[in-house]
Amino acid sequence: MTVGIVEEKSVTFDTELRLESGRILGPITLAYETYGELNAARSNAILVAHAWTGNAHLAGRYSENEQKPGWWNEIVGPGKLLDTDRYFIICANVIGSCFGSTGPASINPKTGKKYNLSFPVITVRDMVRAQQLLIDHLGIDRLFSVMGGSMGGMQALEWATQFPERIASAIVLATTPRPSAQAISLNAVARWAIFNDPTWKKGEYRKNPKDGLALARGIGHITFLSDESMTAKFGRRFSARDGQFDFFGRFEVERYLSYNGYNFVDRFDANSFLYLAKALDLYDVAWGYESLEEAFAQVAAPIQFFAFSSDWLYPPAQTEEMVTTLEKLGKPVEYHLITSAYGHDAFLLEHETFTPMVRAFLEKVKTAAK
């Protein structure tokens, strides 16, 4: 079963948020969706945090005519992993994004114009502090769990270290304690693609800089896949539409990247892409601490980690560093390495594999809370 027709909600907070940079952002609007019902004890809420270019549309459809359901529709609904007959599921669009929450494309109330590059640099920790405003607004003192993959996993880690008293558990998939130099360099090249598009106009564009953003998305998309998955899907097949010896003839993988890149332009804002890429690069769960050990000493709730064998963006060794650190500290931690050909995107695609493990973990958390 599915959650059916859903609606996007939003709330605006008049309070100003002091960011990690020291700058102030406010008022803040957050777009979000909820599924299921909050129980009388307000103890069954699970926050699902989205990745870089995701949004609050986690599951269901806005109308019968919507072509695709929410981005993790397979795990949300009656009888599914995130069972809406048991849990109250929340997903909020992060600040800095472009799907209804305050970001660079929003109107700055002080000027009446779009923020564009006057928008402050934000961090994953800032995103979580904004989420905390929403959780307070919903009247929830303590989340049963926070779950997310990639940048969503970073948010879950921030909840576990910055607000340990407010979560009963965390589920972290395909993430890292800090992006590597290689990951940062790939984001840098993606940024250059946008910067060097003359229609970007230093962020003051009226229409999305389509060529730069499409190229940036193509670079990013490669990092989400694996050699194995790309070989299986495309191999070295040349496009049937192009002549093999045409100068501009393309392999199927080239056509795929172009198609996805230019489709992306229609749904995502270039400045938001840049700001969230910066937030990813700046991420370090140990920011403000002397070490990872000191950061993880704050953890109180059990954390379940998943890594995927072919993920070369945030490889398993980076998850294992976190698991080992938590184990040394005597913290409750569980780790699963899943063999998968899907690369970094495996956290979205291997739900049938990890569902029984997550379900068992949540049952243990529930039993321990009794």
Swiss-Prot record:
The answer on whether this UniProt entry bears the keyword Signal reads no
Q: Which domain of life is it from?
A: Bacteria
Query: What InterPro entries does UniProt report for this protein, alphabetically?
Result: AB_hydrolase_1, AB_hydrolase_fold, HAT_MetX-like
Q: What is the catalytic activity of this protein?
A: L-homoserine + acetyl-CoA = O-acetyl-L-homoserine + CoA
Location (main, coarse): cytoplasm
Q: Name one GO biological process term.
A: methionine biosynthetic process
Q: Where in the cell is it found?
A: Cytoplasm
Q: Where does substrate bind?
A: R217, D345
Keywords attached to this Swiss-Prot or TrEMBL record, sorted alphabetically, are: Acyltransferase, Amino-acid biosynthesis, Cytoplasm, Methionine biosynthesis, Transferase
**The protein's Enzyme Commission number:** 2.3.1.31
Pathway listed for it is: Amino-acid biosynthesis; L-methionine biosynthesis via de novo pathway; O-acetyl-L-homoserine from L-homoserine: step 1/1
Active site residues according to the UniProt entry: S150 (nucleophile), D311, H344
Q: Name one GO cellular component term.
A: cytoplasm
What are the residue boundaries of the AB hydrolase-1 domain, all occurrences included? Answer: 44-350
**Keyword Transferase annotated:** yes
Q: Which Gene Ontology molecular function entries are recorded, alphabetically?
A: homoserine O-acetyltransferase activity
What does the UniProt function comment say about this protein? Transfers an acetyl group from acetyl-CoA to L-homoserine, forming acetyl-L-homoserine.
Question: How does this protein assemble?
Answer: Homodimer.
As for family, the record states: Belongs to the AB hydrolase superfamily. MetX family.
Under the heading NCBIfam families, the entry gives: homoserO_Ac_trn, PRK00175.1
- This chain belongs to the protein called Homoserine O-acetyltransferase
* Organism for this UniProt entry: Geotalea uraniireducens (strain Rf4)
